[in-house]
Amino acid sequence: KKFLFIHIPRTAGRFFTENIKLNNFESETKFIWKSIDGIEPAHFHKELYEKHFNVADIPHITIVRNPIDRFISTSIFLTRMYGDDIQDMVEDPIMLSMMLDNFPLTEGANWFRPQMDFISSKTKIWKLEWGFGKDFEEWISDILDMKFTMKDVPYKKLSTDETNKLMRSGRLIENIRQLYVKDFEVLYPEC
């Protein structure tokens, strides 16, 4: 059975990808580190996966995450590229926008892309905050019409220091809300 897992960065994608393999599925993105149209295929947004993958007639699934938590998690790449002392800069909406628009690693552009840019009308959505227990197994098993079992797999760390994140300040959270308006409206209206 084929399906498309839309891997939105910083939403437990590596964990879920390992579980895909443990359930004897093969990933469409074997060339994960090769850039196509300036983006890693593993992190293709809707426009690119529809262009490069034959996915029109298969189920699409994704995992989303609270945009504030996702941004703070992704901020390890901002501190890596711009330095440790950038808290004041990211609290300025114009500076933050410039930093994201001019992010020096083009393949990483999708790390900060709104989650709604990855989602089509066909996409089945699971929220990271709901966990990966029996409810998740039932949800994905129903979509695939076959049993899917989650296993506890070790977290695959990046080569990046994942502890060097930005602080959650009121100003930064307001900037995040402005960056991801549609994510909040559609995916997280309760936040």
Regions found by a protein language model. Name each.
Residues 1-191:
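Membrane-interface amphipathic segments in extracytoplasmic regions
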